Amino acid sequence: MSDEITILPTTVIGSYPRPKWLRETIRLHRAGKVNQEDLEEAFNDAVVTVVRDHQEAGIDVPTDGEMRRDEMVEFFAERLSGFKFYGHVRVWGDHYYRKPSVTGKIKYNNPMLLDEVNFAKSVSYTQNLKVTITGPYTISEWSYNEYYKTQRDMAFDLAKVINQEIKNLVDIGIKVIQVDEPAIHTRKEDVEWAIDSINESIKGVNVKVVLHVCYGEYSYLEPHLDKLKVDQINLALKNYNYTPVKLFKKWDREIGVGVIDVHNRKIESVEEVAEDLRKLLEYFKPEMVWVNPDCGLKLLPRKIALQKLINMVKGTLIVREELKKKGYTNTTLKPLINR
């Protein structure tokens, strides 16, 4: 695998809409009408579909769409010791999830992602596959704590098991790891130790590490940016009309800029994406900018999600060509800092 990638690399955050036939297969499996082997085949077929969509759109660094994950915390809690589920809780509107409870010491059992990542690698059009994993603070924040003295203690035990999982992914050749922390700015007083737990989760990881943050009070994060040991911060920006950008002007590593609003079915035009990128490049060095949607696309209809990605890439290509005329060609896939 080359250590270089084209200037303004395009990527996705992680999740992608499940095809309707996969949702139906999952429903039938839960009703006892589809066996586990057929369900696994359906998951694999869905990953192939996602990879083809990403290829059609022209995404430089794709994911597997998180086809096997019902929810970003539940998936990992099901696979770790120390968690128990009591039932569903309401998140917002008519959306529910199985909020886990921590009832014992959190321990790592077996690799959680290796099989699905190996399959995604086998069908991907590029070796530059990104793998996402929910971070320690978000899992601790979105779980009930019935065991640990403090949430901080819980988060640091989570960080240790996440670190094991990430290192297993690195061992099979994954070069880009994204830690998802949408909850990191829930409470201002937690941010400093939350960052410490994230750093613990990526300790000794010698590939590119991305931190995805979205939808919250970015100003809580800004005073602590210098403590983050990640190569890239990936942000939801379009939904905010880019107003948080000024908080990250001093950030001197990579930044993933969200230029697609995932909570709006309106499809951004190619020129809209290009113009937004030109404005963002007034704040950040071109070689440090990656291009992505604000967040995961799973809640959008698939046709809309795909067209949003197509337009995102086309808009990026316009600005990429403008940069090439100024002498910019490639950027690096290597990690930028030692951990």
Curated annotation (Swiss-Prot):
A biological-process GO annotation: methionine biosynthetic process
Assigned keywords, A-Z: Amino-acid biosynthesis, Metal-binding, Methionine biosynthesis, Methyltransferase, Transferase, Zinc
Any coiled-coil regions, as ranges: none
SUPFAM superfamilies in the record: UROD/MetE-like (SSF51726)
Family matches, as Pfam families: Meth_synt_2
Pathway(s) per entry: Amino-acid biosynthesis; L-methionine biosynthesis via de novo pathway
GO molecular function: 5-methyltetrahydropteroyltriglutamate-homocysteine S-methyltransferase activity; zinc ion binding
EC number from the UniProt entry: 2.1.1.-
UniProt entry tagged with the keyword RNA-binding: no
HAMAP family noted in UniProt: MetE (MF_00288)
Function: Catalyzes the transfer of a methyl group to L-homocysteine resulting in methionine formation. The physiological methyl donor is unknown.
Similarity remark: Belongs to the archaeal MetE family.
Name of protein: Methionine synthase
Origin species: Sulfolobus acidocaldarius (strain ATCC 33909 / DSM 639 / JCM 8929 / NBRC 15157 / NCIMB 11770)
Lineage: Archaea, Thermoproteota, Thermoprotei, Sulfolobales, Sulfolobaceae
